[in-house]
Amino acid sequence: MQTLHDTSFASFEEKKSTFLAYLCPIKEFDMLHQQLKTEHPKAAHIVWAKRCLNEYRQIVENNSDDGEPKGTSGPPVLNVMRGFELVDVGILIVRYFGGIKLGTGGLVRAYGSSAKEVIAQANIIPFVFKETVRFSTLY
């Protein structure tokens, strides 16, 4: 499994639509999502996917198409994250519509390519399980 420390960014263009992709640690995900909504009020969509480990070391996944046709944006991004075995991270992709419809296949390819591009730009590191342990001794 892999993760990252810092947020990374990449942009991708497909048939005049612009895709702005952000990969961030899960701790920053909600704050970044709100920030992007504020910074990009005219964006057509803000699609996201995230993967994290729960307290039982199970991978919990979620995604949103944010108004794109069902299954054409969030799931492809999530599948890319699975392929790279990323955990405790989220990807947000802001889309500005360029006037040319991409179709369902085009959307799947564009969102998947955006996710791959932002991962390629990121400083990916191995994921290490960490636990806090307290102990005391007499001396």
Predicted features along the sequence, with ranges:
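C-terminal regulatory domains involved in ligand/effector binding and gene-expression control
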Residues: 1-71
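Ordered, amphipathic secondary-structure segments that act as subunit-interaction surfaces
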Residues: 68-104
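Short flexible coil/turn linkers enriched for glycine and charged/polar residues
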Residues: 17, 43, 85-87, 129
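Short glycine-/aliphatic-rich beta-strand segments at the starts of folded cytosolic domains
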Residues: 125-139
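Stable alpha-helical structural segments in soluble proteins, enriched in small hydrophobic residues
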Residues: 110, 114-122
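Charged, amphipathic alpha-helical segments and their flanking helix caps
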Residues: 5-8, 105, 113
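Structural motif
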Residues: 22, 46-48, 88-92, 132-134
